[in-house]
């Protein structure tokens, strides 16, 4: 039996609804958040599959979608030497169940996804900022986060400490016009003959 058939059989056994999605060179499934933990547990404990290693967990922001955040789990079966991708989607106000009780590696990944996107994981109450500064405002990988941020960090020599100030730009935003004012030569350089039509 092929790997995708084994996974679909396992999902059916536990009445878990999964949808196969196209991801180049990988087997991937989309799942609703409430099915996530039972599915991860079944994949880990299945004697045939043994997806015991969480190699990555990350977020993706699609601000125009109703379920804005996609949370992606990359699993590895050492028994089969195969990878599996599990995707789930949540809106900005929803939270997702923490996978750290099933896959302990999820702990740090969940902190990172919270820090970068603001996605809350039920069961992981640690809200430390591990990639941004302690007083950082917002979540920098959201597509609506301003390029300049909200505050700038400076070392104040008089106070002898780091201070946070609102962003103050000395110049206006520049519009980058990539059209060149330089003109190409009217003759063809050796090797460029193929570009001529």
Curated annotation (Swiss-Prot):
It catalyses: a quinone + NADH + 5 H(+)(in) = a quinol + NAD(+) + 4 H(+)(out). Its EC number is 7.1.1.-. The keyword Ribosomal protein does not apply. It is found in: Cell inner membrane. InterPro entries: NADH_DH_suC, NADH_quin_OxRdtase_su_C/D-like, NADH_UbQ_OxRdtase_30kDa_su. It is an enzyme of class 7 (translocase). Keywords: Cell inner membrane, Cell membrane, Membrane, NAD, Quinone, Translocase, Transport, Ubiquinone. One of its GO terms (cellular component) is plasma membrane. Gene3D superfamilies: NADH:ubiquinone oxidoreductase, 30kDa subunit. Its main location: membrane. It is a peripheral membrane protein. Belongs to the complex I 30 kDa subunit family. NDH-1 is composed of 14 different subunits. Subunits NuoB, C, D, E, F, and G constitute the peripheral sector of the complex. HAMAP family: NDH1_NuoC (MF_01357). This is NADH-quinone oxidoreductase subunit C. It comes from Rickettsia prowazekii (strain Madrid E).
């Amino acid at each position: 039996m092929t790997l995708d058939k084994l996974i679909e059989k396992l999902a059916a056994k536990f009445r878990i609804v999964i949808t196969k999605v196209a991801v180049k060179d990988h087997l991937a499934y989309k799942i609703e958040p409430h099915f996530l933990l039972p599915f991860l547990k079944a994949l880990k404990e299945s004697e045939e599959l043994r997806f015991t290693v969480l190699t990555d967990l990350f977020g993706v922001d699609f601000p125009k979608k109703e379920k804005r955040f996609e949370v992606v789990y990359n699993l590895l079966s050492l028994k089969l030497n195969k990878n599996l991708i599990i995707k789930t989607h949540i809106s900005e106000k929803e939270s997702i169940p923490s996978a750290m009780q099933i896959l302990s590696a999820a702990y740090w990944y969940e902190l990172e996804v919270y820090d970068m996107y603001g996605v809350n994981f039920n069961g992981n109450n640690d809200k430390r900022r591990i990639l941004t500064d302690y007083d950082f405002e917002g979540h920098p990988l959201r597509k609506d986060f301003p390029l300049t941020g909200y505050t700038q960090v400076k070392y104040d020599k008089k106070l002898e400490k780091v201070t946070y100030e609102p962003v103050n730009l000395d110049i206006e935003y520049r519009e980058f016009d990539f059209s060149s004012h330089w003109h190409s030569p009217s003759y063809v350089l050796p090797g460029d003959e193929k570009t001529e039509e």
